[in-house]
Amino acid sequence: MTPVFSSRFPKSEVPEWANRYSYTQGGDDDGRVLEIGERSRRAGYFTRDEFLEVCEWKTRGRPRRHYQRNSEEDVRRVTAMALSSADEDKRIWTLVAPGLAGVQMPTASVLLHLASGDPRNPLMAPQAYPIIDFRALWSLNWEKPRRDTFTFWWAYVQTCRALAVECCVSMRDLDRALWEYSNQNQNKAQNTCSD
């Protein structure tokens, strides 16, 4: 079954929620990882240090020891294969473990988000990749499946691309809006449902 996503908030509010976004780590919301993405996009791969920094940003260090098992050679080789593939299925699954130790679909989606077209450019939204995250999924009224599948991933990508185009925002701004809406509302909604 292909999932159907629908936003929990009006599409007209996407820019407003994007502007409220705050995921500060060390004083920088996402500027550093966007710089890494630009460099990786030009080079066609991530270096190990860049990979580790992006993984740290996404996961706040939870599976750090797994990420650190990846060698410089492995990170460059695997990310180059993923970023150069024309096959969408291979593009995402090449990055997921055992491709890169510790990497699951959410982290793989960040690597694609940052290095496949400029995620800050609204004109690139039809080719850009969203970040798959429980917060963004909640904002789109969908739960993360028990098992990651390409069907789920691709439906999410297509939904986010269409939503970004419809709202005239970049994929980065759409991601920020979905994340921030959940950040400010998900726990409140769950608390009122349990009363």
Label the predicted regions.
Residues 56-103:
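Helix-hairpin-helix/helix-loop-helix acidic hairpins
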Residues 58, 82-85, 115, 143, ...:
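Alpha-helix boundary/capping residues
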